[in-house]
Amino acid sequence: MQFSKMHGLGNDFMVIDGVTQNVYLTEELIRKWADRHRGVGFDQLLLVEPPYDPELDFHYRIFNADGSEVSQCGNGARCFARFVTLKGLTNKQDIGVSTAKGKMVLSLQDDGQVRVNMGEPIWEPAQIPFTANKFEKNYILRTDIQTVLCGVVSMGNPHCVLQVENIQTANVNELGALLERHERFPERANIGFMQVINRNHIKLRVFERGAGETQACGSGACGAVAVGIMQGLLDSRVQVDLPGGTLHIEWQGVGSPLYMTGDAEHIYDGAVKS
């Protein structure tokens, strides 16, 4: 089975064409391929499928390194767009895809970057899903080591965002692991640690559900900016610096879609036995 290795700001992917070849996946196979010493090594596996909706171009599926399937990955979406173009699966500049929880438009820019319409942020707790009686801009979450104030949003996947004074000293791995599996997140969550530099610039580290801390998390950057705007901390255009590089996020507020722009790089092509 043919695949490509790609990355978006160091968030790396095994990308498989399920349009022109038969694909057989199991959690065990995905975990085997994800092993960085004995396999391909990746944060997520991305699967390109024929469209479920005749008005769209493709269906987009995402699997974490632990084999679990998730409904969104922003960095992956940019790599998805670059992949289907490189492989000649489409010649469109604007590519319509469906995911497990919605639709997206992926736009190839003249400068080589990819702009993604991520849709509207979702704030209703039941739709995130998050256990709360009503939407609030800030929630209190208690763990064994720390009580935190955070914002919660879905970008097609659940995000919990907390503000920190210094991104370098933030307790990302220990606190992230506890919050990822907090009882109020029935489907677990991605945990963002956000340092606000000014109203147009943040630094961010993300502990991703099923993957741990990654070099970059596109949907996490979107979630952090959406929360920051809702909390009155940020303006509508924000530069997000992640360990792996920079993303640019735009959101005009409630009722508007959120846009993410960034790089997507092809590393190599390979083949595995399935």
Curated annotation (Swiss-Prot):
Gene3D superfamilies, sorted: Diaminopimelate Epimerase, Chain A, domain 1 (3.10.310.10)
Keyword line: Amino-acid biosynthesis, Cytoplasm, Isomerase, Lysine biosynthesis
Compartments where found: Cytoplasm
Listed pathway(s): Amino-acid biosynthesis; L-lysine biosynthesis via DAP pathway; DL-2,6-diaminopimelate from LL-2,6-diaminopimelate: step 1/1
EC number, UniProt record: 5.1.1.7
Family annotation (Pfam families): DAP_epimerase
Top EC class for this record: isomerase
Function comment: Catalyzes the stereoinversion of LL-2,6-diaminopimelate (L,L-DAP) to meso-diaminopimelate (meso-DAP), a precursor of L-lysine and an essential component of the bacterial peptidoglycan.
Record protein name field: Diaminopimelate epimerase
Organism: Glaesserella parasuis serovar 5 (strain SH0165) (Haemophilus parasuis)
Lineage of the species this protein comes from: Bacteria, Pseudomonadati, Pseudomonadota, Gammaproteobacteria, Pasteurellales
